[in-house]
Amino acid sequence: MVVGGASGLSAAGGGDFYYEDNDSYRKYFRPFAEKYHFKGAFAGMMHPWKTREEYWGYLATFLHTTQTAPVRHSYLDLDALLKGKDFFILTTNQDTQFVKLYPEEKVAEIQGDHRFFQCAACCTDDTWDAVKPVADMVAAMGSDTKIPTDLIPRCPHCGGEAFPWVRGYGNFLQGKKYEEQSKKFLAMCWNTKTAKFCSWSWALAE
């Protein structure tokens, strides 16, 4: 069984702060909402930040919110339905909910993952850990909305800024890590009765 999981699953479990000024948005992003007046977490990605320190203060808050969130009840409800079944997860979600619940080999995150950084300029095919740098930025920021300059994450190869390995609001790197995710899905397809349909559908999408 192939299970497709998208943003509605997270929103149903309380991760509904992306598009509107609601209680969960205010819970996690109140300092930014009150100071910069944008409504919804995704709006912050388009905000005209005056400094990189402010920008990364916001981005670190965004990433930390999803990295540290517990498994949401909507995912636990889905898990109950999947008990005893042979399944594979294909998701466009980047918020790490599925990989908190299931082994990595059972999940293909084809739109990226908030746990990793890439080079913003895509100078390298590498991705690397974002969890500790994000935690350090949030700790250093405290109740402020900006981070110290020396904590702005950098690419270890070119020295330019890093960026979350996610599609949608940056220069998404479709390199080694992306290929790993797509190969997991294709391998599952070839091992099932739906091999031809899955593989051709994926090939056409690419």
Feature-to-residue mapping (PLM):
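Conserved catalytic alpha/beta core of Sir2/sirtuin-type deacylases, generalized to analogous enzyme cores
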Residues: 1-206
